[in-house]
């Protein structure tokens, strides 16, 4: 589901068709470079990302094409193509439409990386699987939960002990590079952080992520992803175990739900896209257990 000419946040997931984990450190570095490159061209704010061994996550806010003038298009074109080429006047509307498209953004990212990967590994053929998945995410609580879920991928895979130690993720990029090149947005989703200072915003988000990673099951069995000593060292305050058990294991709600957000947001977006759903019955927002106030378009089974 793509919302045309409206500011919308999407969680994108795309997987390789290759067996195992074909993306090593060098490949992950290259894919991050490509993400940075095209984020400067397209009308987007990158909120989060995570490049894993066989797939990547991207959380982006796509901005409406109507926000950008002809001069904006020409300046972006000139800055991106540094060989001195000029954009033809008749092409300006074409690029305006293209650079506002989530589908075009993801297509260029995947095609550019495929060319690199195939050349680097002396191979031909398809690298990516089915068309990428995209989930519409509401600003606020749904957004920050989705962002934390993305940044905790390396911990769920037992690759690192601290989320910041994984440099191919948004939290790792923020901490290790100090957001080099202003690649990432500091709009983490919760206005109640109550601060404008970027360092304090990042600090608030890191606390939120550590809280999500320090959860316990309601039955008392620990499913902690970060060691208690690490949490104590990183945090100046105690974390309350108030968040759901959604972050410890892969959750389908952050990839297959179609739409997540408040009850009103999900209902409103469903009406907007009602025609594409082949259902005899009216769909209603379903509460996601453990994530208070967050609803899904679909009721999904969880392992």
Predicted segment positions?
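Short catalytic/metal-binding and nucleic-acid-binding patches
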Residues: 1-203, 215-225, 231-303
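Intrinsic disorder/low-complexity flexible regions in very large eukaryotic scaffold/regulatory proteins
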Residues: 205-208
